Regions:
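A charged helix-plus-loop insertion that forms the helical arch/lid used to bind
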Residues: 86-101
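Conserved small/polar residues in nucleotide/adenosyl-binding loops
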Residues: 111-113
Length: 113
């Protein structure tokens, strides 16, 4: 499992011109899965993200987690996090989980967040 995390003051996702999701202050999380991912790994990553102190406190220090600020999450499945361009000029996604498995892992990660 790979996660790419971005702090935001607001964010939204549009698909084919229709708003599918939006948040105010919080985190946008792009997550990708591989066939070797386990329940334990997902649980560990989810807990780590929830506890990361990446938001400023009143003194400007990064001392607060998304939980501390009661921030929101926008979670986007992103198989391209497992792209490889080691050979040739076309990305390979062999390391990415198959779509059905990835969807199940994505749903499992949502339950733990």
């Amino acid at each position: 499992m790979k996660a790419l995390i971005q702090r935001v003051t607001e964010a939204k996702v549009n698909i084919n011109g229709l708003k599918e999701g939006s948040i105010n202050k919080g985190l946008v999380i792009f997550i990708g899965f591989t066939n070797n991912d386990t329940f334990e790994k997902i649980e560990w990553v989810v807990q780590k993200i929830a506890k990361l102190r990446i938001f400023s406190d009143q003194e400007g220090k990064m001392n607060n987690s998304v939980e501390d600020i009661q921030g929101e999450l926008l979670i986007i499945s992103q198989f391209t996090l497992y792209a490889s361009v080691k050979k040739g000029t076309r990305p390979s996604f062999i390391e990415a989980a198959e779509p059905v498995l990835a969807e199940n892992l994505y749903n499992l990660s949502l339950i733990h967040i």
